Amino acid sequence: MNIHLDKYGQGMPLVLFHGWGFDSQIWQPIIPYLKPKYQIILVDLPGFGLTPMMDWESFKKNLLDQLPDKFALAGWSMGGLYATRLAIEEPARVQYLINITSSPRFISDIDWPGVAEEVFVNFYNNLSKDINKTLKEFISLQLNKMKCDFKIGNPPSPEGLAFGLEILGTWDFREQLKQISIPTVYLFGRLDPITPVKTMAIMEKNYPNFKYVLFNRAAHMPFLSHTDLFITIMDEFIK
């Protein structure tokens, strides 16, 4: 099973993982800003876009077979969980890790800010009733009244949506994150309702070796709402 990739530009390989409900087309508005410096590699995650459903191990093997030996890796939201796991398990391949409004754990608990578990349970339960309505509600939550130009791309499969929600609800890399020694940056939006800005303060304390950037006026999509600042941060981070 092949992972669907799209490639643009030349230079340092930069692999981009999208978030839940979208496919790799979400990155299209920023490709013109990135491709003069990087070889952009857009990836459709399992069950999204043109990539079929598959488990983590199958995804990792197939993806690494198609990627350069070394690359920078950026993940947005759910894509940040995929990116973090790949960086933990394949440190010889991943040179830089960029997590965009992502977190090592998305569900809140007594000492960790995040989304209440019942929110994901409701999204999961509503998928079987009305996929389009559920997607629109999730997109509205991400935007938090911000205006962004984005492309939905190919409709996600029901299996991909369900698997993605399972990942958002169960993957937890807070302990394994301490293993990461490659250059790593976390980007947060102060108005983000999904990855709360409170997460940043906790992570700065627990993982002081990472870099942190706060977009004061951004919600969950800073790469689209504040593209110029996002590109500047990327260029300064990836040497």
UniProtKB/Swiss-Prot annotation:
Pfam families reported for this sequence:
Abhydrolase_1
GO biological process terms on file: biotin biosynthetic process
Where it mainly occurs, coarsely classed, is cytoplasm
What are the subcellular locations of this protein? Cytoplasm
> What does the entry list under GO cellular component?
cytoplasm; membrane
Listed GO molecular functions? Answer: pimelyl-[acyl-carrier protein] methyl ester esterase activity
Write down the EC number: 3.1.1.85
Q: Which cysteines are joined by disulfide bonds?
A: none
What top-tier enzyme class does this entry carry? Answer: hydrolase
Which UniProt keyword terms apply here? Answer: Biotin biosynthesis, Cytoplasm, Hydrolase, Serine esterase
Active site (catalytic residues):
S77 (nucleophile), D192, H220
Give the quaternary structure. Monomer.
Q: What is this protein called?
A: Pimeloyl-[acyl-carrier protein] methyl ester esterase
Which organism does this record belong to?
Legionella pneumophila subsp. pneumophila (strain Philadelphia 1 / ATCC 33152 / DSM 7513)
